[in-house]
């Protein structure tokens, strides 16, 4: 809600598709840091829409499950050739856009600390960037 207020002048709307069974098994501060960074980036680049979704999914080749969190926007997206670069500490996707270039690197560090994975691609629904995080669930 805070980000919607900050970006209200641009008319960006945040939508939610949340699985009621999806629970993050970790420190609340880590989850807030991850979501804050991903949503801030999405709002920065979005034309009009941001989507946050969560779900629980089966882990491939295992009996375990994992939490999947995705943040998508309808902005210009990130070219495949630029994905690795924008995940580096201190690198920004566009020098004209405000930021320090450390947010995505922090997200990646936190995800790795939980033995999770982060994937960056194009949102099939919105057309912009999609950041998908997967965290193993212990139960």
Which stretches of residues belong to each language-model region?
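Short beta-strand/loop element within the Bergerat-fold HATPase_c
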Residues: 49-64
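Acidic ATP/Mg2+-coordinating residue in the GHKL
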Residues: 73
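Short conserved segment of the HATPase_c
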Residues: 78-90
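Short alpha-helical Gxxx[C/S/T] motif in the catalytic ATP-binding
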Residues: 103, 107
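Conserved catalytic submotifs in the C-terminal HATPase_c
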Residues: 13-23, 57
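Glycine-rich ATP-binding loops of the HATPase_c
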Residues: 115-122
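Conserved polar catalytic motif of the HATPase_c/GHKL fold
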Residues: 36-37, 41
């Amino acid at each position: 809600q805070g980000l919607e207020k900050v970006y209200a002048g641009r008319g960006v709307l945040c939508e939610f598709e949340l699985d009621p069974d999806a629970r993050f098994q970790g420190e609340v501060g880590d989850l807030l840091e991850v979501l804050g960074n991903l949503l801030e980036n999405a709002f920065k680049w979005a034309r009009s829409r941001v989507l946050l979704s969560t779900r629980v999914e089966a882990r491939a080749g295992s009996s375990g499950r994992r939490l999947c969190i995705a943040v998508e926007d309808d902005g210009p997206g990130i070219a495949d050739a630029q994905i690795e670069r924008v995940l580096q500490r201190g690198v920004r996707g566009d020098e004209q856009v405000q930021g320090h270039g450390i947010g995505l690197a922090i997200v990646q560090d936190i995800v790795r600390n939980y033995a999770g994975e982060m994937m960056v691609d194009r949102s099939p629904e919105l057309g912009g960037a999609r950041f998908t995080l997967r965290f193993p669930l212990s139960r």
